Structure formats: C-alpha cells, structure tokens
Amino acid sequence: MFAYFRGRLTSAMPDEAVVDVSGIGYRFLVSAFTYRQLPPPGEDVLLYAHLSVKEDAFLLYGFSSESERQLFRLLLLTTGVGPKLALAVLSGLQVHEVHEAIMANAPERLYGISGVGKKTAARIILELRDRILKMSPDGGKTIASGSGGNLALQIKDDALNALITLGFSKPAAQKAVTGILEGNPSLSVEEVVKSALVSIHNS
C-alpha cells in the first residue's frame, strides 16, 4: 500500500521513530540497524514502509533501505515468524549477514538473536532457501537439473537467480557474479552468492 514516507524526523528511539509528513505524525517500528541510520530529530528522512494490519491496530514498519524491507517481508514467510521476530532478526544482523547465513546453510549465525532459538533458526534457513529456489526466474529448474550442460554456466545462473530472488537488481547481480567467477571459477553456488552479497554491500 505504501512504498515510502519522506518527511521530518520528530523523535526516535531504538525501536521506533516518528516522522512528520505534511503535518501528520506517522509512528514507525524500526530495527536497531535503521535506528542507527536515522538523522538527528528535525532533519528530513526517508523510510521504506511496510503496513501490518491487525484486528485492533494498523502498524507501520520503517526501514532505511529497500533491501532491509525486502528481507523483512521474506522473513515473514517463515512459519512462526511474525513482524516482531523479523524485526529482531534485522536488529541482530545486517541484511547481508542474514543473506549469507541463509545461503551458507548456517543457522548457528542466528542463534544469538533475541527470540531466535535453534528450531526457529533452522526453519528460517530451510524455508527461505526453498522459497528462494521456487521464486527464482526459471522456477528452480536450472538448479534442479543436476546433469548435463556446462557446470560453470549452471553455477553462474543459479547464483544469479538466487540474488535476483533476494531482491537485487539483475545488472548488479550479474556484475557481482561475473566478477567473482572471473577471479575464482571453481567456487560453488553458495560461495559465489556469499561473495556476491559482500561485493554488492560494499559497492
């Protein structure tokens, strides 16, 4: 419903921010990461928005980047993960760190986050990796076909599809994947994706 809000930051705390947009104050629930990106009160700010509708309330969640909002929505697809826990994950790790944990099948990286136990971490890894494959542009067919074709090309396509599904633009994903494979063509799909996430984040 809402893409983003641009206005004047009137107040901020580690878990929420109030933005004045044309005389109307909007309260956003935010992650610790977004809180650290906020300007001082009184300055202009842009927050990417997600609206959560409950029986008794409409809650706005605000994010400092589109990639953080995309990951928040992806986390909500996990069984047992609601907005509060998804926000906790984003407060505990940066976006690229969560991506890396998912693609590297490393649930132990999520254990230290408040509210995330071993079972929840394992579900996040399992369910999001599966959804990434299913949501890829080719429906996961390239990844599913383990035989035939050029292995290097298959690895490149698999990594590219995974990055696009995670919300990165195709040009950015192609640039990162191509550069990484040129330097080390023997990497696995997971290693390429992990390196690409770091490359895109630092670019």
From Swiss-Prot:
InterPro entries: DNA_helicase_Holl-junc_RuvA_I, Hlx-hairpin-Hlx_DNA-bd_motif, NA-bd_OB-fold, RuvA, RuvA_2-like, RuvA_C, RuvA_C_sf. Keywords: Cytoplasm, DNA damage, DNA recombination, DNA repair, DNA-binding. It is found in: Cytoplasm. GO terms for biological process: DNA recombination; DNA repair. Pfam families: HHH_5 (PF14520), RuvA_C (PF07499), RuvA_N (PF01330). SUPFAM superfamilies: DNA helicase RuvA subunit, C-terminal domain, Nucleic acid-binding proteins, RuvA domain 2-like. It comes from the Bacteria. Residues 1-64 are annotated as: Domain I. GO terms for molecular function: ATP binding; four-way junction DNA binding; four-way junction helicase activity. GO terms for cellular component: cytoplasm; Holliday junction helicase complex; Holliday junction resolvase complex. Residues 144-150 are annotated as: Flexible linker. Residues 65-143 are annotated as: Domain II. Gene3D superfamilies: 5' to 3' exonuclease, C-terminal subdomain, DNA helicase RuvA subunit, C-terminal domain, Nucleic acid-binding proteins. The keyword Cytoplasm applies. Residues 151-203 are annotated as: Domain III. Belongs to the RuvA family. Has three domains with a flexible linker between the domains II and III and assumes an 'L' shape. Domain III is highly mobile and contacts RuvB. Homotetramer. Forms an RuvA(8)-RuvB(12)-Holliday junction (HJ) complex. HJ DNA is sandwiched between 2 RuvA tetramers; dsDNA enters through RuvA and exits via RuvB. An RuvB hexamer assembles on each DNA strand where it exits the tetramer. Each RuvB hexamer is contacted by two RuvA subunits (via domain III) on 2 adjacent RuvB subunits; this complex drives branch migration. In the full resolvosome a probable DNA-RuvA(4)-RuvB(12)-RuvC(2) complex forms which resolves the HJ. The RuvA-RuvB-RuvC complex processes Holliday junction (HJ) DNA during genetic recombination and DNA repair, while the RuvA-RuvB complex plays an important role in the rescue of blocked DNA replication forks via replication fork reversal (RFR). RuvA specifically binds to HJ cruciform DNA, conferring on it an open structure. The RuvB hexamer acts as an ATP-dependent pump, pulling dsDNA into and through the RuvAB complex. HJ branch migration allows RuvC to scan DNA until it finds its consensus sequence, where it cleaves and resolves the cruciform DNA. This is Holliday junction branch migration complex subunit RuvA.
